[in-house]
Amino acid sequence: MSTSTEKRSKENLPWVEKYRPETLDEVYGQNEVITTVRKFVDEGKLPHLLFYGPPGTGKTSTIVALAREIYGKNYSNMVLELNASDDRGIDVVRNQIKDFASTRQIFSKGFKLIILDEADAMTNAAQNALRRVIERYTKNTRFCVLANYAHKLTPALLSRCTRFRFQPLPQEAIERRIANVLVHEKLKLSPNAEKALIELSNGDMRRVLNVLQSCKATLDNPDEDEISDDVIYECCGAPRPSDLKAVLKSILEDDWGTAHYTLNKVRSAKGLALIDLIEGIVKILEDYELQNEETRVHLLTKLADIEYSISKGGNDQIQGSAVIGAIKASFENETVKANV
């Protein structure tokens, strides 16, 4: 493939792949994990690994970059990548994993590596089968298990891996990656837009890149136009702080009918999901100064129950009324010191 063709091919990639770190030095925000894993490799004592933590924190990028440093051009022969959320049953363990782990490369020294992404989606039977395969083929194969939630993995599987928790990326790491992308894509991002993007990402770099790519697609002239915070909120489908405050102010100060009208008006005008409004309102309520902390406890518990009902398919109109009722009831005898 020619250089120009490769360049065009890379330009057409989703940004989460286009800007995926190729070396461990390019992985941001997980310095302790990188240092420890590198030490394992340098000493020739790489154990089975478990990387767990929220999405978009660099779990897959770290192990793939590590594997490329270890194997170089022989990567495709020595590494098997599987996504357990696609093949979550016992057959994938018995067939693909076992077949790969049981064979040796004639002209290659060292161990093979099996990367099992989203392993917390595997059934318990598949995890138990995987544990037996790990035990049997440890001599020539290493496993790296990736998961969002470690508690969804069986204790037997957990005990056979050295665990590393990937924290949500710190603001500094996200800012560095955003700056890098803006330079390469020749984009302009307002300070308020960058602040909104970092806040909405919750430490998820994958979401940052997806939102930036969506924002670029909305611009008439990407080389000249600046991405505003309104564009960020629009592409995220997230409520703006001003909308959240307007809804909360109406609930606290207006009668039931007006509050219900305001809530529905904001939702329909901005195309917002009720669950996003609840999450935004909770963040605002966390900063309120209350005379009685029991008010906060009672209200957050009620909102959590409503959020759970929505996740189980509850009617949005009914749950929207429940939100108004929960907030009004909780603040009925409470003096709010903070202004909306």
From Swiss-Prot:
Subunit structure: Replication factor C (RFC) is a heteropentamer of subunits RFC1, RFC2, RFC3, RFC4 and RFC5 and forms a complex with POL30/PCNA in the presence of ATP. Component of the RAD24-RFC complex which consists of RAD14, RFC2, RFC3, RFC4 and RFC5 and associates with the checkpoint clamp DDC1:MEC3:RAD17 complex. Component of the ELG1-RFC complex which consists of ELG1, RFC2, RFC3, RFC4 and RFC5. Component of the CTF18-RFC complex, which consists of CTF18, CTF8, DCC1, RFC2, RFC3, RFC4 and RFC5. RFC3 interacts with ECO1 and POL30/PCNA.
SMART domains: AAA (SM00382)
Annotated ATP binding sites: 16-20, 28, 53-61, 148, 206
Protein name, as recorded: Replication factor C subunit 3
GO molecular function, one term: ATP binding
Species lineage: Eukaryota, Fungi, Dikarya, Ascomycota, Saccharomycotina
Pfam family, one: AAA_lid_RFC1
InterPro entries: AAA+_ATPase, ATPase_AAA_core, DNA_pol3_clamp-load_cplx_C, DNA_Rep/Repair_Clamp_Loader, P-loop_NTPase, Rep_factorC_C
Main function: Component of ATP-dependent clamp loader (RFC and RFC-like) complexes for DNA clamps, such as the POL30/PCNA homotrimer and the checkpoint clamp DDC1:MEC3:RAD17 complex. During a clamp loading circle, the RFC:clamp complex binds to DNA and the recognition of the double-stranded/single-stranded junction stimulates ATP hydrolysis by RFC. The complex presumably provides bipartite ATP sites in which one subunit supplies a catalytic site for hydrolysis of ATP bound to the neighboring subunit. Dissociation of RFC from the clamp leaves the clamp encircling DNA.
Chain positions with N-acetylserine modification: 2
